[in-house]
């Protein structure tokens, strides 16, 4: 399959390795409440599940009220805002993929659940050299994945057909959103897969064990 006209990507765990900065933020939050340092694998596996999941893990909030979780989620995000560019890097292979897309003038862009106040600066700092044609955040559509509205907007702004467009992400909600938008789906198995989850159970059209594997779908 090498006639894909649009490659849409998730951000955290797909294009960028943001887990080290989330680990820093989680440890700062835990330190504020006299907890020991967090387990990196636990943090990494939760990044794509969002800040509420990270805050719940950080302070053992699984059985607490939504209001308490939200309070500490905001605390975590305030810390993250100050450290979100410290250690975040591009995943191995992503630079090659994006260069190939740009060189061949194939449409691509980013659809993320990350709020724009964080995503915009991180994308500019880490991916600005690749000139992403679009960055779509929940703020833009009033919904988060697995709702497909972000992907539908991506299809609209890029003037792309769903049947010739792929969405690649590292969580089942990415695959669900892609399916709802009637797009081809790809699982980034190298990303932040939740512990005890199985990428193969997501039933995506493609599975990429490394970012460089995506190149197999790009026309030569």
Task: Explain the meaning of each model-derived region.
Residues 6, 145-175:
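Conserved Lys-Pro-Asp/Glu-containing loop-to-beta segment of HAD-superfamily phosphomonoesterases
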């Amino acid at each position: 399959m090498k006639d894909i006209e649009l490659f849409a990507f998730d951000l955290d765990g797909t294009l960028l390795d943001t887990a080290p900065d989330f680990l820093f933020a989680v440890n700062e939050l835990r330190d504020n409440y006299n907890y020991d340092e967090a387990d990196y694998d636990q943090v990494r596996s939760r990044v794509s599940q969002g800040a509420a999941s990270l805050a719940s893990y950080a302070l053992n909030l699984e059985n607490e009220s939504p209001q308490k979780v939200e309070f500490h989620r905001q605390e975590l995000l305030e810390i993250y805002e100050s450290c979100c560019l410290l250690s975040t890097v591009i995943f191995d292979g992503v630079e090659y993929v994006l260069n190939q897309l740009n060189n061949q003038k194939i449409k691509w862009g980013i659809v993320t659940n990350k709020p724009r106040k964080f995503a915009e600066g991180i994308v500019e700092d880490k991916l600005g050299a690749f000139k992403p044609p679009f960055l779509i955040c929940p703020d833009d559509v009033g919904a988060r994945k697995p709702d497909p509205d972000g992907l539908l907007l991506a299809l609209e702004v890029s003037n792309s057909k769903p049947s010739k467009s792929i969405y690649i992400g590292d969580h089942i909600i990415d695959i669900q959103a892609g399916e709802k938008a009637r797009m081809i789906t790809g699982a980034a198995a190298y990303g932040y897969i939740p512990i005890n989850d199985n990428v193969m159970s997501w039933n995506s059209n493609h599975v990429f064990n490394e970012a460089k594997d995506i190149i197999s779908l790009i026309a030569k």
